[in-house]
Amino acid sequence: MIKHNLVSDLRRLFIDFFVKNGHQFFPSSQLVIKDDPSLLFTNAGMVQFKQRFTSVDDRSINTAVSSQKCLRVGGKHNDLENVGHTNRHHTFFEMLGNFSFGSYFKERAIELAWDFVTKELALDKKRLYITVYHDDQDAFNLWKKISSFSDDKIIKIKTNDNFWSMGNVGPCGPCSEIFYDYGESVKGGLPGTPEEDGARFTEIWNLVFMEYNRTEEGELSVLPRKCIDTGMGLERIAAVMQGVHDNYDINLFKALIAMSKKESGNSSCEIAHRVIADHVRSAAFLIAEGLTPGNEGRDYILRRIIRRAARYVYMLKYTDSLMYKIFPVLIDETSNAYMADYYPELFKAKDLIISILKTEEENFKDTLVRALPLLEKELTYLSTGDVLSGDIIFRLYDTYGFPVDITLDIIKERGIRFDEKGFYDNMEQQKTRSRLSHLIKSTEQLNGKIWEDIRQNYNNTRFVGYDNFQVQSKILSMVMNNDRNVTVANVGDKVSILMDITPFYAEAGGQQADTGLLSVVRRDGKDLFGSSNIADVTNTKNIFDGLYIHECIVKSGSLIIGDIVSAEINSHRRKDLCANHSATHLLHYILRMEIDNNIMQKGSLVGNDKLRFDFSYNMALTEKQIKLIENRMCDLIRQNHPVETNICNLQNAMDNGAIALFTEKYDNHEVRVVNIGNSKELCCGTHVKYTGEIGCFKIISESSIACGIRRIEAVTGQYAIDYFRQQEKVLYQVAESVKSPVEDVLVQIDKINRENQELKQKLWAAYFDIIDMQGVNIEKIGNINFLHGTLSSVPIDVVRKFIMKRLVKDMIMLFSNVVNHNKIYVVGVGNSLHSKVKAADFVKIIGCVVKSKGGGNAQLAQISTEYIAEVDVIQHIKDELVSIFNA
């Protein structure tokens, strides 16, 4: 019998019950599925066990229990627009589940479920109802036997709500649900009735009996190993146990909502607080797993969640950032919303979560301030049932960056409809403009219309560059100066060339394009030996997903449409590109293995001279970590692992552990997998044949490029050797400069620094003497000591240090100083006076006199001006002091 009904208590009770009944406990898998680009986020408890359901041979684990983090935003399962408006929808939720992989089936699954809800949770049986699939008489009979329910409490459902499948083909089976009756005070009817959408009867547990396999023809056959997959929403069962029929009234959400109301100072607009509470939790978990707000894929989902919450913060008329102030409730042990005990990643990433929530919300406030008044103006002309023009919605999105889903939220609240056709017509026009713009950009002002016309006449270029550095190819089309078709290109002409076959890799996946030569070997059916008709290939682009455009400069002779050319890439450059690309894969692998398994690639650039790798991580790498990465890389290079590529379907690649970037688009049927030791990635780039060809590896920089995103730059092969030589050269130059042997350079530099510091101290003391000699005037104004003086050619940092050293709590100091024809005023105010006046206040007063602006804080501030005419600034300050302190 349960003694406590907090969310954390219920989670522990569920897990303990099934462990006691022979199930192996599995921690929650991540929301971000790194090896499955077909799924945005984990959206059900069974996701981490996918392969166990489909593998007949894997019998290492027969049963499991978990409490799984889930997110339903985007894709098939998208609850975002309902969040805050209903009692039970969330973006993030936890799914309690028990699973059997051929161990037990219907009867045992039903027994366990019934024992848990009636004995462990002690729910009133009178309030429970059961649904089964209408054809599943077996489940009906078992429920009747185990629960002793009458027929009217076991409801047969004919719709697919009670038949579950993993997809259009594959494992599937009937399911059975347990419903809880909140009583007549809540509206709603029994499952299967017209009133079933009400809140009275709430599904609390779904038991899936996976016993069939569906073929592509839709036929069902019995699985050789029958499985059980169950799911109980933790928030839903918490609502039942806490005697509320609204998930937002459970202890966890009450704590989050209370903090939202407290920090915002606004207790009205309940929907806003519910949305904010839900979205803070979702965003925190996503950031903890390495996501950062962006414009593509999963990163955009995170941005979308934060921005949607920011809009509701704006509705509360709260002008500061709010979300980052609510998040700490989730990691506060004394809070009812404490989740960091079961999910320690929240505490580990707390600084990053706070930083990203604050920054992203602040940035979006500007968009809200600009766009919302325009939307509000348009809505004043509309009434309930009217339609908001798609042109307006698109303009808000395109011009102001105002998310469409937020616009839809706003108009939905007012009963105004969405002009879907008008909006998507605008989007299609924009896509067309964008596609042409991309063509123009990708081929240096290339006329996109010309290439669209060419595209209609030719098939995709056949790329053979993985295995060939040189091939013979036919020139099919040429565009001169990016604006006209030509049949001949002569010396000096810049021409974009389409050929039927090419070894030139076009820029993709972060790897730069190949360069090389085209030499005419046959013209008009005649072989040309020692041809002088040559063009340099300076760049290669892949447009229309398959048309390779070679940007060339004719160096000698001419090129004519129909010519057969020897197309040869710069092999030395290609080998450098291959080395850097393979090293990039290994770097990604090492970062995840040695630094943090949550690290995700955020971008890369593979050049011939260096590589650049951007990744999610919330702190700078230490010197020790960088050394570890370099050592592991050198180990992998010395081990000379073969680099293997294979083509397979996407699902097979994922099942074998290949990593895919969610921002990339992959063919559902065929993908290219690059295997380097234990590193497996989907990749279309070029690579070395053995890791030994990388030669050597050196990280040359590690830095932050955005909140939560780090960047590593590195060199390999000859470029790494050149880097070492350059560093060695600098070291010898430094040794010569400080007159020391190389091995003693650090000792000598340390000695020089100490001597320099001693001299600096003497210099500061001398400057202080100069200030004293140039004249420091002391006046008493009431109880205040006012020190002021006029200086000449004293460094400004010396003046600031002088003030900070001499300033006492009841003193105000003001010095003017002429430096490089500018007059600079520096003001200091003692701590005890800050309640009445601050240094920055005096700078504003001076600014009004000398027509300039300055800045500072309560204790120290300064202002610079070219206005050097004699103005009695001192007298203005004295008058102000008399006024402030009533002297």
Curated annotation (Swiss-Prot):
Gene3D superfamilies: 2.40.30.130, 3.10.310.40, 3.30.54.20, Bira Bifunctional Protein, Domain 2, Threonyl-trna Synthetase, Chain A, domain 2. PROSITE patterns: AA_TRNA_LIGASE_II_ALA. Its EC number is 6.1.1.7. Keywords: Aminoacyl-tRNA synthetase, ATP-binding, Cytoplasm, Ligase, Metal-binding, Nucleotide-binding, Protein biosynthesis, RNA-binding, tRNA-binding, Zinc. Zn(2+) binds at residues 581, 585, 683, 687. GO terms for cellular component: cytosol. InterPro entries: aa-tRNA-synth_II/BPL/LPL, Ala-tRNA-lgiase_IIc, Ala-tRNA-ligase_IIc_anticod-bd, Ala-tRNA-synth_IIc_core, Ala-tRNA-synth_IIc_N, Ala-tRNA_ligase, Ala_tRNA_ligase_euk/bac, Thr/Ala-tRNA-synth_IIc_edit. It catalyses: tRNA(Ala) + L-alanine + ATP = L-alanyl-tRNA(Ala) + AMP + diphosphate. One of its GO terms (molecular function) is zinc ion binding. Its main location: cytoplasm. It is found in: Cytoplasm. Binds 1 zinc ion per subunit. Its cofactor is Zn(2+). SMART domains: tRNA_SAD. One of its GO terms (biological process) is negative regulation of DNA-templated transcription. The keyword Transcription regulation does not apply. Consists of three domains; the N-terminal catalytic domain, the editing domain and the C-terminal C-Ala domain. The editing domain removes incorrectly charged amino acids, while the C-Ala domain, along with tRNA(Ala), serves as a bridge to cooperatively bring together the editing and aminoacylation centers thus stimulating deacylation of misacylated tRNAs. Belongs to the class-II aminoacyl-tRNA synthetase family. Catalyzes the attachment of alanine to tRNA(Ala) in a two-step reaction: alanine is first activated by ATP to form Ala-AMP and then transferred to the acceptor end of tRNA(Ala). Also edits incorrectly charged Ser-tRNA(Ala) and Gly-tRNA(Ala) via its editing domain. HAMAP family: Ala_tRNA_synth_B. This is Alanine--tRNA ligase. It comes from Ehrlichia ruminantium (strain Welgevonden). The lineage of its organism: Bacteria, Pseudomonadati, Pseudomonadota, Alphaproteobacteria, Rickettsiales. The gene is alaS.
